Amino acid sequence: MFKSGFVTIVGRPNVGKSTLLNAIMKEKLSIVSCRPQTTRNNIQTILTEDNYQLVFVDTPGIHKPKHKLGEYMVKSASDAMKDVDLVLFLINPDEKPGRGDLFIIEQLKEVKVPVFLVLNKIDENPQEKVAETLKTYSELMEFQEIIPISALKGKNVDLLKELMFKYIPEGPQYYPEDMIIDQNERFIVAEIVREKALRLLSEEVPHGIAVEILQMKKNEKGTYHIEGNILCEKNSHKPIIIGKGGSKLKKISQYARQDIEAFLQSKVYIRLWVKVKEEWRDNQSLLKELGYKKMK
């Protein structure tokens, strides 16, 4: 008997959805940063074992939108809860249910498939706090399973996979067994660069950073030559991203190159520039160019 199913992971921004996905896959697949809302596109990640296949939809955190990009991210997360076989609602024990959590719960009550409550970061919180959070959420709605985990340390991740297998239906293998992600290489490369920029810039530059890959060519020796722009919204942000004597941009390129080489399994040369595009997050045509779906 072979089983297959689509699983979506939902939760507030920065709750650890991408970290959980990486722990399940044991590979770095989704942009992870300490900054909220760093996952912007629904990334379908495929886990294939001998007797099952799980297709994960890693979504942006649900939050109140402040611009067109925010509207896209919220719609993207909401749409992902439709037409799936299982929903994982990820929370942190050290945070009481806020407006964002209550908003998600109201949506989950309308879902016709099993919903798991997954408590992340249990290694960072005392058992009493975890138990208190469990009780609070259990009173808000009924969950098919409640699983405490540590996505970062991998604790109880195998148990979570076993429970997911239990709930998904019998079905075909939708993707080839060697396929682990359904996004193209350019998208992944852009996300890796953006992650490094977010990490290195910390709070120096607001969240309005995007990356566009201008060129990505592979020569006869198998080496990739990549060129791209880091987009920011204000002229004042440009020198911050570049850094003194180009030091910050050089570090972004260096750290990104290491991860891109691991992803592509090839040597990589990468050149990055910084370009100002004011209010790009409200520019519908530019959002489309960067791979974000058109809002209806």
From Swiss-Prot:
Keywords for the protein's UniProt record, in alphabetical order: Cell membrane, Cytoplasm, GTP-binding, Membrane, Nucleotide-binding, Ribosome biogenesis, RNA-binding, rRNA-binding
Locations listed in the record: Cytoplasm; Cell membrane
GO biological process: one example: ribosomal small subunit assembly
Region (G2): 37-41
G5: annotated span: 149-151
Region (G1): 11-18
Binding residues for GTP: 11-18, 58-62, 120-123
Domain Era-type G: 3-170
Predominant cellular place of this UniProt entry's protein: cytoplasm
Ranges for domain KH type-2: 201-278
Any GO CC annotation of this UniProt entry: cytosol
InterPro entries: G_ERA_dom, GTP-bd, GTPase_Era-like, KH_dom-like_a/b, KH_dom_type_2, KH_sf_prok-type, P-loop_NTPase, Small_GTP-bd
Region (G4): 120-123
A GO molecular-function annotation: ribosomal small subunit binding
Membrane association type: Peripheral membrane protein
Cytoplasm recorded as keyword: yes
Family assignment from sequence similarity: Belongs to the TRAFAC class TrmE-Era-EngA-EngB-Septin-like GTPase superfamily. Era GTPase family.
Subunit relationships: Monomer.
Cited function: An essential GTPase that binds both GDP and GTP, with rapid nucleotide exchange. Plays a role in 16S rRNA processing and 30S ribosomal subunit biogenesis and possibly also in cell cycle regulation and energy metabolism.
The protein's name: GTPase Era
Organism: Clostridium botulinum (strain Kyoto / Type A2)
